[in-house]
Amino acid sequence: MKAKKHYGYARLMKILQPSKDRVEPVCPVARQCGGCQIQALNYEKQLEFKHNKVRNNLIRLGGIPEELLDEIMEPAAGMKEPFRYRNKAQFPIGRDSDGKLTAGFYAGRTHQIIPVPECDCVLGVKENKEILDAILEFMQVEHIEPYNEENHSGLVRHVLIRYGFRTGEIMVCLVINGKTLPHSEKLVKRLTKIPGMTSITCSINREKTNVIMGTKIQLLWGQMYITDYI
């Protein structure tokens, strides 16, 4: 795809012989989705890949001597269970090829939405599915359209979800292409049934931009923040 002086960028076209380190991704759309590009790599090799990526950047961009990194840099710390760990998720909202309302992630290097199967991304917390299901059902019932970036029409652009692993607190923010979210009280009534719900807001973003969040936040219910502990 692109060649630099000391390295290049490439795209996988065909697998002739699978590596011994290749595994079957847990998510069926991992290959198309831009959310977890190395899920087909076994976890130990993922940690090694991330370690080397940081190391190479420190050498190439930071000018740190290799000998010093060999002496002080420790291996990447892993997890017992490398799923359900992300405390933040941003889902673009749109329609699939059949016209059905959907939430997902952008395919790599595009703005094509790859729907998350059953609205349940294996990297995010399980509560995300219930939240997305509630929002999509609300939009369907109330005839609220998703944002269309081609003609700048529609209302709901993204859904941002944050989760506090230590506190169990949940924040939901709908990014909208408008001043208000119609019938928001109905959505609030549904979302507040989810244990841990603490903050429900709207972010106003009416610009023709790739930037997700707007500059103005409307509080629909609860408080403007959640808390967690490190």
Annotated model-derived regions:
Residues 1-230:
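Accessory RNA-recognition modules of RNA-modification enzymes
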